[in-house]
Amino acid sequence: MRQKYYIEAAARGLVGSCPGQARYLLWAYSSTHEDNSTFQETCPHCFQLLVLDNSRVRLKPKAKLTPKIQKLLNREARNYTLSFKETKLLRKYRDSASVLLITCRTCNRTVRHHGKSRSFLSALRSSRAASAASKASPKTPKRAAAGSTNISQSVHGSKGRSPSSTVRTPTSGQSTPICSSRNGSKRKKHFSQLKALLSQSASDKNPTLDFRHFLSSL
């Protein structure tokens, strides 16, 4: 590649002083290398550098969208069956591309440089849109999964905090269910004693039901 750039730079430097030598350098390099090693802005027939003085450039645009082609496109979008002639016309419209025509004034030959067709550009546009959608799609499930995990955690947490679903294991500092039942029976007994004290008008007759005795029993 460096040799190619060096020869092209040397040929451009010799165009004004010795154009024949410049053409010879370009021809010698192109004849000893592959076809894809041709120089840009160079005539492939006479190896003359194509500049504004010795070349003519024209642009042949691609086929325009006519009302007839628009009608055929609408029919195709509605899944209507098209004839062979109509299908061929649509294919010609989609495969049409702009052409750059460069005519060399030295050898009077024209070089054609074809552009990209409409079908290629539409496929490229759809592939870019698909790639952009594929890049953006993995982020959405992650966010949804994160939201679902948060919801599930909150649901499980709320369920775990409910007293009906928790299983409380007694520790060393806590009382067992037997002790709790005993305390409940004691409370009932004390409540009955207090009720008896309040209901009786004279407590002196029964010393076992004295209010001081009740408080000391607590």
Swiss-Prot record:
The keyword Phosphoprotein applies. The modification Phosphothreonine is found at residue 140. This is UPF0711 protein C18orf21 homolog. It comes from the Eukaryota. The modification Phosphoserine is found at residue 126. Residues 130-192 are annotated as: Disordered. Signal peptide: none annotated. Pfam families: DUF4674. Residues 147-156, 173-183 have a biased composition (Polar residues). Keywords: Phosphoprotein. Residues 130-146, 161-172 have a biased composition (Low complexity). The keyword tRNA-binding does not apply. The lineage of its organism: Eukaryota, Metazoa, Chordata, Craniata, Vertebrata. It comes from Rattus norvegicus. Belongs to the UPF0711 family.
